[in-house]
Amino acid sequence: MEKEKKVKYFLRKSAFGLASVSAAFLVGSTVFAVDSPIEDTPIIRNGGELTNLLGNSETTLALRNEESATADLTAAAVADTVAAAAAENAGAAAWEAAAAADALAKAKADALKEFNKYGVSDYYKNLINNAKTVEGIKDLQAQVVESAKKARISEATDGLSDFLKSQTPAEDTVKSIELAEAKVLANRELDKYGVSDYHKNLINNAKTVEGVKELIDEILAALPKTDTYKLILNGKTLKGETTTEAVDAATAEKVFKQYANDNGVDGEWTYDDATKTFTVTEKPEVIDASELTPAVTTYKLVINGKTLKGETTTKAVDAETAEKAFKQYANDNGVDGVWTYDDATKTFTVTEMVTEVPGDAPTEPEKPEASIPLVPLTPATPIAKDDAKKDDTKKEDAKKPEAKKDDAKKAETLPTTGEGSNPFFTAAALAVMAGAGALAVASKRKED
């Protein structure tokens, strides 16, 4: 675009020059054409008259008119040429001003772009924006960019120098790693024996692996005698045993707890001094109390029945529930009697009563209400054979006098009429019995 503007500008300049040359050539040609046929007027007599005659001739008049017209044309051509030149000059000046403004703006944009690349401060950017010429912009740009490049090189050099200073040879790096590992192992060994921090600091300040080994040997040689302690792990995910050497139980416990912690075992600790054994049992997971079933207690039932004797147990949440279960059990086994309960031993006792009323028909015992489901019970414990024999012997001994009494009663008792509870019959029977007794006594006295 800029090149095209320059070409147009030079074409206009060339046209202006060509127009000026053409006008000058035209004026020169006209003057030559007018002057060429006229020669010097010879001096003759009566020249005034002759001149007057020639001046008024048609040829002379025509020539004069042509000369006047040519002069007018020349003047007009010159005026047009001058006006065109002035206009061209004004346009060229305006174009040059616009081109200069464009060049100035482009130079500023290029300079600011380069300043941003090097991180130049706003102070220098303002100087560029206030510059009036392209040459001034380029000069300032060159100076600022050169300074920025030098600053960058200096920073990079300093950074590289620091980096190189921080680097160590590969051999030194390997030695440093070996030294660090030796220190870690040495400190672990010292922890087993409960060595003080003073000796650990000596290890940490050692400069070579050999120095660490010498220190650890000296320290261990000076330590008191150690014992072997054992750890039993009862964890959810880790179970097993391990041992360690330590000067006392406290030191061993510290080592074992660290070991358990490293392996994610957290539980209750116990120690047996006789076997020098620690045991850690991991705690069970905590369960929400609302999810737990009620606690149950074991209750016992002692049965003293006519046909069933023994004991049984059941588990229940309270004594009332156990009592219902026991009564249902007794009822199912035909046991009905007097119930007692001992809270201290959680024991129920049912004793079946032996009641015989003469003349009364045996009646079935009333069954208690079974309002709850049966609770499984432990079957009643049978009575041992030896105990049973003893009981049978006692029963036989007890039955002998009872049999005599029963015989006496049978002899004295009248036949039943179905009204065993009639008071009148009872009184009559007693009177008869008394009379019979009196007669027997009297007859006996007479015999004596």
UniProtKB/Swiss-Prot annotation:
Residues 228-352 are annotated as: 2 X 55 AA repeats. The gene is spg. It is found in: Secreted, Cell wall. It is a peptidoglycan-anchor. Keywords: Cell wall, IgG-binding protein, Peptidoglycan-anchor, Repeat, Secreted, Signal. It comes from the Bacteria. Residues 418-448 form a propeptide. This is Immunoglobulin G-binding protein G. One of its GO terms (molecular function) is IgG binding. The modification Pentaglycyl murein peptidoglycan amidated threonine is found at residue 417. Residues 1-33 form the signal peptide. Residues 386-410 are annotated as: 5 X 5 AA repeats of [DE]-D-A-K-K. Transmembrane segments: none annotated.
